[in-house]
């Protein structure tokens, strides 16, 4: 969520010259997690932890996951899913929902547009012709309902961040469609390439042919599995040593089997 929302803020700044943001991590491009600027667009990282996302009424919403989490708050996965459905129901009339392919949500408001995104599975927004470059970066073409944006590269490595970039571009595409301002493909490519990431989100401190040291905030089994898979794809055949920090007693208690499998 943090990388995707920070990407939305950075891409919006590049495309419009303005915009504000409330982010859940420290953006390296902006030098903080609060961005204040001109223009009507505001990027917010919504949080389901204490149901605070139900205080938001977005024009465009991105849902990257509705996995079981925060069961100390919700009690059951079904109760969490109901909260996500309520959040989706708060999207403004004429707005848009961008949801990850495979995430099952109840969508009860017919007055919004619904789009699916994925890493490379064909749907409304996805990456194709993905090529691994030196240092774990990727080149890819980004497919949108309005056409293909070719030759994209992201300033940070990892295949999971390609998926985040697809989601962020989808959000900007929806906002631009609503405002009648088509995306500028060249400026979008430049903004993706200049994105520096977020502290503690797949952050590399050492990246040499002999040694690599990186830090990631992945604190859910599925996030952890995605981070480990990304590292293995970037450095095939290399020895991987992982230091795991349990985050919240209740989450560790509820998902210790899934953490072990990840």
Segment roles from a protein language model:
Residues 135, 140, 145-262:
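Nucleotide phosphate-binding/pyrophosphate-handling subdomain across enzymes
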Residues 49-52, 68-71, 122, 135, ...:
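Short, acidic Gly/Pro/Ser/Thr-rich loop/turn segments
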Residues 4-9, 13, 122-128, 151, ...:
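Short, basic phosphate-binding NTP loop
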Residues 51, 119, 131-132, 145, ...:
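Short polar/acidic secondary-structure junctions
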Residues 21-25, 100-101, 111-134, 153-159, ...:
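Beta-strand->loop->alpha-helix junctions that form or flank phosphate-binding loops
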Residues 1-101, 105-113, 166-175, 235:
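Phosphate-binding loop of NTP-binding sites
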Residues 29-30, 124, 250:
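Generic structural signal for helix capping and beta-alpha/helix-loop junctions
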């Amino acid at each position: 969520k943090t990388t995707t929302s920070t990407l939305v803020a950075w891409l919006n700044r590049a495309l419009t010259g303005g915009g504000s943001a409330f982010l859940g991590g420290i953006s390296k491009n902006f030098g903080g997690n609060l961005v204040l600027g001109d223009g009507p667009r505001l990027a917010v990282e919504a949080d389901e932890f204490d149901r605070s996302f139900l205080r938001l009424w977005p024009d465009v919403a991105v849902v990257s996951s509705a996995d079981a989490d925060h069961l100390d708050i919700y009690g059951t996965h079904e109760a969490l899913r109901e909260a996500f459905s309520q959040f989706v129901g708060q999207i403004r009339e004429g707005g848009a929902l961008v949801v990850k392919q495979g995430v099952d949500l109840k969508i009860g408001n017919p007055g919004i547009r619904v789009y699916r995104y994925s890493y490379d599975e064909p749907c409304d927004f996805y990456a194709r012709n993905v090529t691994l470059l030196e240092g774990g970066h990727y080149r890819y073409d980004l497919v949108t309902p309005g056409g293909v944006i070719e030759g994209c590269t992201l300033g940070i490595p990892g295949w999971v961040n390609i998926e985040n970039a697809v989601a962020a571009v989808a959000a900007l595409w929806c906002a631009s469609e609503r405002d009648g301002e088509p995306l500028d493909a060249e400026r979008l490519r430049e903004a993706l390439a200049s994105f520096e990431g977020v502290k503690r989100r797949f952050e590399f401190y050492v990246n040499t042919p002999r040694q690599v040291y990186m830090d990631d905030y992945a604190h859910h089994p599925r996030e952890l599995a995605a981070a480990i898979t990304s590292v293995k794809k970037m450095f095939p055949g290399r020895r991987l040593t992982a230091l795991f920090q349990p985050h919240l007693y209740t989450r560790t208690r509820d998902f210790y089997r899934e953490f072990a499998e990840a």
